[in-house]
Amino acid sequence: MSGWYELSKSSNDQFKFVLKAGNGEVILTSELYTGKSGAMNGIESVQTNSPIEARYAKEVAKNDKPYFNLKAANHQIIGTSQMYSSTAARDNGIKSVMENGKTTTIKDLT
């Protein structure tokens, strides 16, 4: 089963999306958007940029946990991963976003 996007509305009336793998695990989380159209544009940007390996910035948090950001061509962060236990796990997360990010399935929970 391939992945999907879930679009949701936060308690302060802002919008965000997550990308889920086929097993239902969240593999990428967006920033908050003030409008639904901004979040939809963010999903479109992930669909465009997720197959491009150069768009992934491999990072390490202050607690030494590896994670990654997916960036657009203008270097703006589109989405952020979870914190991983190892760099190998992070790299597998990137592969999962590269594979699942192209999906056109969007579950609108707003």
From Swiss-Prot:
Q: Looking at the keywords, is Repeat present? A: yes
Keyword field: Repeat
Q: InterPro entries this protein is in?
A: DUF1508, UPF0339_domain, YegP-like_sf
Q: sequence repeats located where?
A: 10-58, 61-109
In the UniProt record, does the keyword Membrane occur?
A: no
Family from the record: Belongs to the UPF0339 family. Duplicated subfamily.
Q: What is this protein called?
A: UPF0339 protein SO_3888
